[in-house]
Amino acid sequence: MAYKENYPSKLLEEAVDAISSLPGVGRRSALRLALHLLKQPQENVHHFTAAIDHLRDEVKYCRHCMMISDDDVCSICSDKARDHRTICVVESVRDVMNIENTGQYHGVYHVLGGIISPINGIGPSDLTIRELVARVAGLVSPEALFEAEGQGGAQAEVILALSGDVEGETTSFYIYRQIAQYGVKVSSLARGLGFGDDLEYADELTLGRSIVNRQIFRP
């Protein structure tokens, strides 16, 4: 028998509608959360809603890597101890957080904001690939090469840390074609991750090893 909802309050139903619009939250879970909020002290609920308002209205995106940040430049890009000649390309902010949790990567990032997915109407222009190409071009500018020579002459590297499914591989190949002309090293994660696995669901040990043992990207 189908689950039928009968709400004693229109306001409660509207709250359930809003909460259930979140990914992974069904209507029963949304109802449970809404009823829980009703039991909380008013100041707790105000703190909860204020945090969401501030997140939506005040969070910024780093002008270099597109990571979410409280400032125009995120804490990773502003860290001079990081290797700014190594850029790890990821699909989402969550991927950055997962890689950082491994403690195995010390470069910077570039968040694409998705992957190429024709079936979902997402093309290269819908992602931050153009900004990535500009960053890579900057790595081989005379000024950047002179600075790198003073720091040991390390070759610039782009790590394609995208999922191994068809869409992820398509995106990696497209990016490779866009940046190959600049002569930077292009690598991808070692395939400790299964085909189609997302970084979000990889355990820290497996993900860390995939980064350390990364391989030259073979188009």
Predicted regions and their residues:
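Cys/His-rich Zn2+-binding cysteine-cluster or related metal-binding knuckle/ribbon modules and their
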Residues: Y3-L12, S21, L31-V96
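Pocket-edge positions in alpha/beta enzyme catalytic cores
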Residues: K4, G121-P124, L199
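Solvent-exposed alpha-helical segments within well-ordered globular domains of core cellular machineries
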Residues: E13-D17, L31-L35, H46, A50, ...
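Conserved, well-folded catalytic cores of nucleic-acid-processing
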Residues: A18, L22, Q40, L55-E58, ...
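Extended interfacial segments that mediate partner engagement and assembly in macromolecular machines
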Residues: A30, D79-L162
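Alpha-helix N-cap/helix-start motif
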Residues: V45, G121-I122, G168
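Long C-terminal interaction/binding lobes of large macromolecular proteins
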Residues: Y105, V133-V140, F146-E149, A154-P219
